[in-house]
Amino acid sequence: MGKLTKNQKLAAEKIEAGKAYSLKEAASLVKEITFTKFDASLDIDVRLGVDPRKANQMVRGVVSLPHGTGKEVRVLVLCTPDAEAAAKEAGADYVGLDEYIEKIKGGWTDIDVIITMPSIMGKIGALGRVLGPRGLMPNPKSGTVTMDVAKAVKEVKQGKIDFKVDKSGIVHTSIGKVSFSPDQIRDNAKEFISTLNKLKPTAAKGTYIKSIYLSSTMSAGIKIDPKSVDEI
């Protein structure tokens, strides 16, 4: 490993090795140890006591963060002509159908979320090879396949995110920006962890939330005591 920069040294000094911080402490500390010139994203990693290889222990869901993600989310709506006006009014960045399907077939994926209607899914199935690996495939479980595309656009723009546990049992997602206040960071983290708790599979045995780490794009991870999440 190369030499630590001055800022990395300062950050390392602020984090006590082996200590599990309260969520309240971590929400302030992550701001103190981030020295980027840009507004870094805040990431949370939660290790769950599940075996994701078993279908009855898969954890996936959606959560509406009270303060949003701080990111500009680019939304494409693939819909029938009668739904286009409502989708545009709701704030969709791109609205249409066949022309965008052709663009995606050609490799265009300059978007963050795709919302569509059940009747359109037959056309979108062929795009799986392009959209699947990028996590862009619309899914009824995440609310991106719906008759009410306008409502779905508003929810995504306001901070609704979807997530799922990876092969190693970790759920990783972004819950805001370093510019958020400690209270906003804490509120978003609490909402996310509360949602995970509600999704605990009945087949999961033992400790469900094994560890929680909060970090920014360029910072070290701060270990959080899971018991502190519900503290007022």
Swiss-Prot record:
SUPFAM superfamilies, per database record: Ribosomal protein L1
Gene3D superfamilies: 3.30.190.20, 3.40.50.790
Disulphide bond pairs: none
PANTHER family, per database record: 54S RIBOSOMAL PROTEIN L1, MITOCHONDRIAL, LARGE RIBOSOMAL SUBUNIT PROTEIN UL1M
Function: Binds directly to 23S rRNA. The L1 stalk is quite mobile in the ribosome, and is involved in E site tRNA release.
Subunit and interaction comment: Part of the 50S ribosomal subunit.
HAMAP family assigned: Ribosomal_uL1_B
Protein name as annotated: Large ribosomal subunit protein uL1
Organism for this UniProt entry: Bacteroides thetaiotaomicron (strain ATCC 29148 / DSM 2079 / JCM 5827 / CCUG 10774 / NCTC 10582 / VPI-5482 / E50)
